[in-house]
Amino acid sequence: MHWTVFLLRGIVGFLWSGWVQVGYAKGGLGDNHVHSSFIYRRLRNHERREIQREILSILGLPHRPRPFSPGKQASSAPLFMLDLYNAMASEDNPEEYLVRVSLAGEAKETRKGYPASPNGYAHRLHLPPRTPLTTQSPPLASLHDTNFLNDADMVMSFVNLVERDKDFSHQRRHYKEFRFDLTQIPHGEAVTAAEFRIYKDKGNHRFENETIKISIYQIIKEYTNRDADLFLLDTRKTQALDVGWLVFDITVTSNHWVINPQNNLGLQLCAETGDGRSINVKSAGLVGRHGPQSKQPFMVAFFKASEVLLRSVRAASKRKNQNRNKSNSHQDPSRMPSAGDYNTSEQKQACKKHELYVSFRDLGWQDWIIAPEGYAAFYCDGECSFPLNAHMNATNHAIVQTLVHLMFPDHVPKPCCAPTKLNAISVLYFDDSSNVILKKYRNMVVRSCGCH
């Protein structure tokens, strides 16, 4: 019942730009083809602010992120994360998500066969299964990376913070340094995998017959008068003329940095020939910060929330719903639309799934939410009256409750129309530091309804 009440309140947020959109579905409980009629009402400012706070709370964000203005060319980290988003989103709702990216790096959803509504909203919320469009050819994200998604509920990419090369000793004159800020990671998230990625173009023709060894080190301790102590993390061997992304495993180091952020002194990278001669990383073909934006080095980490964190989130959500229900009982009926506003006794139908589309773009969040532009949340509404037929997905308890309600209508209420199956959505967004975050939010989309 609480979920139904929440969704009915959420009707106010159908059109975040300032309009309410209410749809009545036609069809059975399992019918994904939703046809709608619409009622519009302009939102008051305090309603819009409340909706913004609620959505940010669901996303686990204390405030609206305000990233730096992106450049004209899409950079490597967001492109990589878009590939992961496609993989994760197609797994969550394979018929819902399809992402393409423009040269400016702006993510857009496409939905085949969606006639536009007066405010740009789709009336038809079903797509036949299709392979998601990718941001790169070939994709930046490999099968190995997408496999990490099975154990992760959040992925973050980090940009290199080093703006000027250090002067190292003659022995390490060709070393390059990289630093990443991991302090923005939410509390309770554990690193399941982490990678450092750097792009390799063709190396200098002098080394065309050479095998080049590229090594990545963790900086253990820094000194003012000599080179830092280094710990070897990973090594890759490649031919000078090879082209593509080199991936280094830095999982253990990333976990150490998350637990002990004061020890995050960064990474150093070097390139050597087969006989051990240190060479300039640019001569080896490695692309640094002066290269194209789409080939910039970056770090990516996969996270999974601890069970303690999940329990605390569920407890906080439960308390919040209780407080919301208390406030609703004292609320002016004219302030928020209720089920009775849209479902008169003549219109009331059996329990079924109805349209509810949430648009991030119309909320004005397109500068920090990369994808999706919005999502079809749906909600459940309708009567659970005797007899409960097979199409109502009624539980045995609901059937018994219906019979008892017939005998004692003043003491036992009817069963409630509620979701019987919920799906997750994936959201890709920038944080305040312009790091890109991909996070899975569970129980966000109603797949089917029934009587409970």
Swiss-Prot record:
A single GO cellular-component term on record: extracellular space
Annotated InterPro entries: Cystine-knot_cytokine, TGF-b_C, TGF-b_propeptide, TGF-beta-rel, TGFb_CS
PROSITE patterns for this protein: TGF_BETA_1 (PS00250), TGF_BETA_2 (PS51362)
Single GO term (MF): BMP receptor binding
Biological-process GO terms, alphabetical: allantois development; anterior head development; BMP signaling pathway; cardiac muscle tissue development; cardiac septum morphogenesis; cartilage development; chorio-allantoic fusion; ear development
Ranges for region Disordered: 316-345
Prosequence residues removed at maturation: 26-314
Localization of this protein: Secreted
Disulfide bridge map: C351-C417, C380-C449, C384-C451
Residues bearing glycans: N209, N325, N343, N393
KW Secreted (keyword) present: yes
Consequence of gene loss (knockout): Deletion mutant mice show a number of skeletal defects, including small ears, several reduced vertebral processes, and a reduced number of ribs and sesamoid bones. BMP5/7-deficient mice lack midbrain dopaminergic neurons due to reduced neurogenesis in the midbrain dopaminergic progenitor domain.
Keyword annotations from UniProtKB, A to Z: Chondrogenesis, Cleavage on pair of basic residues, Cytokine, Developmental protein, Differentiation, Disulfide bond, Glycoprotein, Growth factor, Osteogenesis, Secreted, Signal
Record Gene3D superfamilies: 2.60.120.970, Cystine-knot cytokines
Signal peptide boundaries: 1-25
CDD domains on file: TGF_beta_BMP5 (cd19395)
Subunit structure and binding partners: Interacts with ERFE; the interaction inhibits BMP-induced transcription of HAMP.
Function: Growth factor of the TGF-beta superfamily that plays essential roles in many developmental processes, including cartilage and bone formation or neurogenesis. Initiates the canonical BMP signaling cascade by associating with type I receptor BMPR1A and type II receptor BMPR2. In turn, BMPR1A propagates signal by phosphorylating SMAD1/5/8 that travel to the nucleus and act as activators and repressors of transcription of target genes. Can also signal through non-canonical pathway such as MAPK p38 signaling cascade to promote chondrogenic differentiation.
Record-linked PANTHER family: BONE MORPHOGENETIC PROTEIN 5 (PTHR11848:SF139), TGF-BETA FAMILY (PTHR11848)
Similarity field: Belongs to the TGF-beta family.
Protein name per its UniProtKB record: Bone morphogenetic protein 5
Source organism of this protein record: Mus musculus
Classification of source organism: Eukaryota, Metazoa, Chordata, Craniata, Vertebrata
